[in-house]
């Protein structure tokens, strides 16, 4: 936000791009009486921002990839990348409209026009990656505000090298590189027998949310597998 006036923007737009439209009256904001349970002001709005997601987060990323061979789940994993303090989960969405009869109560999917679609309407957010508070002088809607963003970093380098080791058949070296990333996050360490291309890409999802062009990476590895005739790719 220290940029000159003419060079400033509302910021990173991470809250806009990744957060759900929890505040929107047409679909997500209704209370049990059909009125507004959520509003775009006050508590929640100052931190969750004005989401309008271009990238909807799914339950696979929020829940499934945090399971491990030690029987941890997203609820009890020691992995800091899924620590409760770092995420904003579904049960933490609290109706913030003082005029609502459900003010202060948790979001209820049954209030939606289509309750079965709740998983795409209100979903967990890796808040530690997407939230940057507005500058005190910033008057634009909270959309992620101004902050630094990764271009590249060591964790991705380790995971790229781990993948290279995997293609060469050296799963021991691959596990060592993956464990450098997992150890930093306090996640349970793995062994060479755990290493396959699926695990490597799950680890990329756990570590590199918002940092990698994931579709491009999946396409890249699909071409490699097709070239090698692996797993039905041709």
Region spans (language model):
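Residues that form or immediately flank small-molecule/cofactor binding pockets and catalytic motifs
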Residues: 87, 205, 223
